[in-house]
Amino acid sequence: MPDVSRRSFAGLLGAGITASQLPLAISGCSPVSTVTDPERAQSWYIDGLSFLPADLSDIRASKIDAFICDISAIEQVEQADGTVNYRRTYRACMESIGAARARVAAHPDLLRLALTGADARLARKEAQTALFFQIQGADCVEESLSQVDEFYLEGLRVLQLTHHYGNVYAGGALDSDDRGGVNLPLSARGYELVEKLNQRGVLIDLSHASARSAHDAIAASSQPVVLSHGAARAIVNHARCSPDNVIRAIADGGGVFGVFMMSFWLTTAPEPQTRHYVEQLRHVANVGGIDAVAIANDYPLRGQENLLRLGNDNTQGVQEYLPWWQSLSERNVLGFDRQPSHVVIPELNNLDRMARIHDAILDAGFSASEADKVMGGNWLRVLEQVV
């Protein structure tokens, strides 16, 4: 089934084909973007979560103007009972943010460390890409909230409360007990952290948080909050996906919800396609309004690296996730009873994904102004308001 460019969109409508029936590229195809240079000049491309790549040429090739850059580092920690856990510790993350800051400073022709939302516009004016440093989990704030100040001075501008599992601040989406998944609230220390982040101008990220903790944080925050990378539970009934009431609450507070690239949380279809990604975007728009919809990645800019080595063969690529998936299935965590069959949408697992998404949402009937909001305008609005 061929990809349909929006240049042929009007003709198809005239033939009686509705927007919901329009085909998008099947897995393995590599459609060429039809977004023209003048159109691109008017649009912002902002990625809600990726990483500083080993090859910095990936940044220019991706055509993104800015992205939330996860600079987390994980340290092996021995628990009191002798078991080993892996956490984003203060020490590990302080080292990693320092290294990332030095790397950005060494490439002023290409990169700008964004310390305020306004830096995104300055970066674009200077043909740079703006990076908003983020850490995926408040575990890095260990001893005192004064450590938030230390990270802030190093350039941290987005902090995620949890990563998969809860901590002293908030419940995680995948928390469980002997009876199955649990939905834990924000703790007293979590409320203090929210207040501190608001005071400092650090954007609060609810990705990986439990639904209850997400609602608590939204209610407590004096600023918009975001869920930088996730998907809708109404489409895939899974603990890692967000229920509509969380999406709506984020939107009502002026925040945004970024839809990521992990296809097993985007669709239950056996072959993930771009249209499934667009369906997630449309669902967020229907629930929270167009001002809440945003793009995210959660893989490196060029894509999920193991899948790229495998030629985007999902049958092979999904194998690395199955032991972890099975472990949570045994704990009766929502959604893990259905084994995944894919990891990526092949036609989006590449450096050109933003332009391809731009094409796809225009082909699906989003207006040009709506597409501009989704591709980066909504991210820009929130970053400028909060950071």
What is each residue range found by the language model?
Residues 3-23, 29-180, 237-247, 251-252, ...:
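N-terminal hydrophobic targeting/anchoring segments and the immediately downstream early-domain regions
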